[in-house]
Amino acid sequence: MSTHSRSYKIRVPATSANIGPGFDVVGLSLSLYLTLTVTVPDPPSASGGADRPSISYTGEGADEVPLDAYKNLTTRVALYVLRCSGVQAFPPGLILHAHNEIPFGRGLGSSGAAVIAGVLLGDAVGRLGLSRERMLDFALMVERHPDNVTAALVGGFVGSYLRELDPSATQAASVPLSEVLPEYPPDAGPDWGRDPPQPPGGIGHYVRFGWAKEIRAVAIIPRFELSTATAREVLPESYARKDVVRTHIIDSEFKSL
C-alpha cells in the first residue's frame, strides 16, 4: 500500500492592540509571524500516541515552549477545537514544526498568535471546514479580549467587540479557562478531557478599517517581558467624562487613515 502525506503551512501574524482610543477593540496585524509546518501521514501512521504529535520549535522562545501536545498552547487549542467538533484526537503520526518570530511578553500578541494557530491547526488536520466567524468563537473562548486574536485571524486593521448574548450563551462563553483548556496531568490519556465546553455561536464581531498604503508601522520592542494581566492592573477602574469625550473624538479620525 502506497503512503502519501498531507502537508499544511499555517502562518499567523503578530499584532498590536489597544490602538489609540480603541482599548480592547482595535487591533493591527504586523509582519512578524508564527509559522507552523504540519505533516499528516495518509494513511495515518500507527506509531506514537494517538493524540501526541511530534513537535519541534525554533525561533523566539524556543527554549521556553513545551513540546508536549498536552502542555503546548497551540496544540491544546487545536485539541479543544477538534474535540468540540467530534474528533477526539490528532491524526496518528502528525509532525508539527513551529518557527516563531514574535517575541514573548512584549505587547506583540504572541499568545494570541499561538491561539489562532491552534484554531487553524485543528480546523486543518480535522478537515472541519470552519467558517472564519466560528474560528473566532473558538479563539474567544481562550482569549477573552477580541482585539489581538481578531487581527491575527483576519489580518489588517480591524475593530472587534463581544456581542451581547442571551443569558445561556453568556454563561457558556464565560466558563473558566481551566475548563476550556484543562491542565492535563502527566498520565493523561486519550480519554482525558473528551467533553470540553462548546463555544456559543457569534461571540464576537469585527469590522475592517481602511489603511493607507503609505502608512508603515514601527514597533519598539522592550527588553523586558510583561504579561497582559500585569499590565492591565495599573489601569484605573473609571475615567473622567472629559477623557471619554476626547477619546470619542479621536475615534472618529480612524476613517482618515
Predicted regions and their residues:
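Short amphipathic alpha-helical face segments that pack within enzyme cores
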Residues: R76, A113-L121, I249, E253
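ATP-dependent small-molecule kinase catalytic core of the GHMP/sugar-kinase superfamily
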Residues: L130-L257
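DPxDG-like acidic metal-binding loop motif
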Residues: L32, L108-R132, A152-R163
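Short, conserved micro-motifs enriched in small and acidic residues
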Residues: D68-N72, L108-I116, V245-H248
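Gly/Ser-rich catalytic serine loop of serine hydrolases
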Residues: E101, G105-A113, D147
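ATP-binding N-lobe of GHMP and related small-molecule kinases
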Residues: M1-R106, D123-L130, L165
